[in-house]
Amino acid sequence: MVRKITKTNPNLIKLIRNLRKKSSQEGAAIWKDVARRLERPTRNRAAVNISKINRHSDEDETVLVPGKVLGSGNLDHRVQVVALSFSQTARDKIERAGGECLTLGKIVEENPAIKNIKIIE
């Protein structure tokens, strides 16, 4: 018999439910995909460094990380980063480059029908 593993973080559970709900209401499949990625075990969740965001993004682009953004590397252009969480050094480097750090819950409420977003894992 397979053991079902459930999330114990109530904020994450609420976020996943909200993402699924917005996906069906707005017809935006991206939120369903992000919810599925967040349901993975913690050890399989994305942890992305600033250097990877720098390599795979362009000026004034929106990047979504379904996990944590870490502060290793440099960012040389302005980018809007949406993630589950940020390390303090990552937040400082993004803001120093003129970018913006947003949480997943905030972006889903403000702009549920978002377009032109790049997912980086």
From Swiss-Prot:
<dbReference type="GO" id="GO:0022625">
    <property type="term" value="C:cytosolic large ribosomal subunit"/>
</dbReference>
<keyword id="KW-0687">Ribonucleoprotein</keyword>
<dbReference type="InterPro" id="IPR022947">
    <property type="entry name" value="Ribosomal_eL18_arc"/>
</dbReference>
<dbReference type="InterPro" id="IPR036227">
    <property type="entry name" value="Ribosomal_uL15/eL18_sf"/>
</dbReference>
<keyword id="KW-0689">Ribosomal protein</keyword>
<dbReference type="Pfam" id="PF17135">
    <property type="entry name" value="Ribosomal_L18"/>
</dbReference>
<dbReference type="GO" id="GO:0003735">
    <property type="term" value="F:structural constituent of ribosome"/>
</dbReference>
<dbReference type="InterPro" id="IPR001196">
    <property type="entry name" value="Ribosomal_uL15_CS"/>
</dbReference>
<protein>
    <recommendedName>
        <fullName>Large ribosomal subunit protein eL18</fullName>
    </recommendedName>
</protein>
<dbReference type="GO" id="GO:0006412">
    <property type="term" value="P:translation"/>
</dbReference>
<dbReference type="InterPro" id="IPR000039">
    <property type="entry name" value="Ribosomal_eL18"/>
</dbReference>
<comment type="similarity">
    <text>Belongs to the eukaryotic ribosomal protein eL18 family.</text>
</comment>
<dbReference type="GO" id="GO:0003723">
    <property type="term" value="F:RNA binding"/>
</dbReference>
<dbReference type="InterPro" id="IPR021131">
    <property type="entry name" value="Ribosomal_uL15/eL18"/>
</dbReference>
